[in-house]
Amino acid sequence: MLRPLRKSVLASCRHCFKVCGGLPQKQLPLFSPLLLRARYSSTDSSTKRSNKSDKIDAPGFKKIFLVAIIGTVIFVKTVQSLDKNKPKTTLSEEEFENVVKGLKRRVAIFPQGEVDIKFSLSPSIEETRKVLQKSQGDDINELQFVDPVKVIDYYRTLRDDRYEALLNEYYKKYGCDTYAYNLPTGMLVMLLGRYFKENFKAGDKLVVVNFPHSIADATRFENEVSIVSKIFVPRKLSGSDVCKYYETVGKADII
């Protein structure tokens, strides 16, 4: 009895399998809303991730601009530093005037009494020597004469001197006889002081001829180089401002 029952059950199962196997299976359409939503969601997420990644990886414009400015500032400062460290071998007229304005010498090159310096308004060493020979005799043998024009010529022709180029400009403009007295304010006295410092010593007796041409040069010389003990003035120049200036302090000697 059990055998026929088992056969019946097996037959029923086979029948059900055939029926179920034969039914068409339900499939999602190719463009179903669910599928589109899934795809859009996936693409949108990917785009957001990409944008976020770009924002993180790419430097901002402000940062680039700031870096460029900092780099420029560093470059400029470096160039300026190199320019400052570079030795300057020449000076223009404007630069020299700025140097003179900023120069505040506390003491003269030679303290008062260390050297004996006299001025002469005679135009040359020869004329000054001739006049002094009559009045002082052999005493002039101890004197050393200085012609400012020759001093300026010395520095004008001194190779690679910082004032060589500027002095040559004035030489071409004014000529050999007068250019020394047309230099920028203070330059003649400055170069005279430099020459005195390089060539003379304590105890020397000096006469500077054809100098000064103005009270300003006279006072500048005494402030920067040394106090003058006397000035020799030809009679024809006794009415000049320079002569009157030194007469007030009892240093003018009319010759």
From Swiss-Prot:
* Record-level GO cellular component terms: mitochondrial membrane
Q: Determine if Mitochondrion is one of this entry's keywords.
A: yes
Compartments (UniProt record):
Mitochondrion membrane
Instruction: Transit peptide: give start and end.
Output: 1-40
Q: Which organism is it from?
A: Saccharomyces cerevisiae (strain YJM789)
Q: Which cysteines are joined by disulfide bonds?
A: none
The Swiss-Prot or TrEMBL record describes its family as follows: Belongs to the AIM36 family.
Q: Which gene encodes it?
A: AIM36
**What keywords were assigned to this record?**
Membrane, Mitochondrion, Transit peptide, Transmembrane, Transmembrane helix
Membrane topology, as annotated: Single-pass membrane protein
Top-rank taxon of the source lineage equals Eukaryota
Q: What is this protein called?
A: Altered inheritance of mitochondria protein 36, mitochondrial
Q: Which residues cross the membrane?
A: 64-82
Q: Does the keyword Ligase apply?
A: no
Main location group = mitochondrion
